[in-house]
């Protein structure tokens, strides 16, 4: 499947070389202290920051020259992204082991707004968020865009809320992010709601 016409490197270069107001429309700055959320498989020594160089997912780089890390802007979306293929969630097997990492921007992070960029690429935003058959295209896009920004913002296919894909040439992000906390989901709460309540009441999961 080919979502792009022409040489993508040249197309993106022309977009970024165009009028400054175009750049302002597609590039956002995430301020220092912005908080992100990520569910991870275990505690990992209290570390939530890890850029995966071996990932083979939507916005990983084909060259593996940089690792990718996915973050959500709400814990609800972080939970849904992690458990997207689950029908039932087990408290003992899942919630006691899996953890919510809260991570903070340690510096200003420049991200590309995929919703603003897609029309300039003459590509439907929905196609970029399609099934795994589009990964060759989205990974190529990530490869090109990683030369212009720290990451990109896209909308979760599951909640419609913003998610962030970040790239770094260091597994620890080289000072881009700061760990705030890593908490087992059995102990995690946000705005007075436990992770279990969010999963059941807001995300409609069956939690046993």
Where are these regions (language model features)?
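Active-site and NAD+-binding cores of ADP-ribose-processing enzymes
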Residues: 2-62, 85-208
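Extended catalytic/binding region for NAD+/ADP-ribose chemistry, centered on the ART fold
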Residues: 59-89
């Amino acid at each position: 499947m080919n979502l792009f016409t022409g040489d993508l490197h040249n197309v993106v270069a022309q977009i970024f070389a165009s009028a400054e107001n175009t750049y302002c429309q597609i590039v956002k700055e995430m301020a220092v202290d912005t908080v992100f959320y990520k569910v991870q498989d275990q505690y990992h020594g209290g570390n939530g920051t890890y850029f995966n160089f071996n990932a083979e997912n939507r916005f990983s780089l084909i060259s593996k020259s940089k690792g990718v890390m996915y973050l959500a802007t709400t814990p609800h979306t972080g939970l849904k992204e992690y458990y997207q293929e689950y029908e039932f969630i087990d408290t003992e097997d899942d919630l006691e082991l899996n953890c919510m990492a809260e991570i903070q921007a340690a510096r200003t992070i420049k991200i590309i707004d995929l919703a603003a960029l897609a029309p300039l690429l003459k590509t439907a935003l929905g196609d970029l968020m399609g099934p795994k058959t589009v990964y060759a295209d989205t990974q190529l896009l990530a490869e090109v865009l990683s030369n212009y920004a720290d990451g990109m913002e896209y909308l979760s296919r599951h909640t419609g809320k913003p998610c962030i894909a970040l790239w770094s040439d260091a597994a620890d992000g080289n000072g881009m992010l700061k760990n705030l906390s890593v908490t087992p989901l059995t102990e995690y709460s946000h705005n007075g709601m436990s992770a279990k309540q969010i999963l059941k009441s807001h995300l409609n999961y069956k939690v046993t």
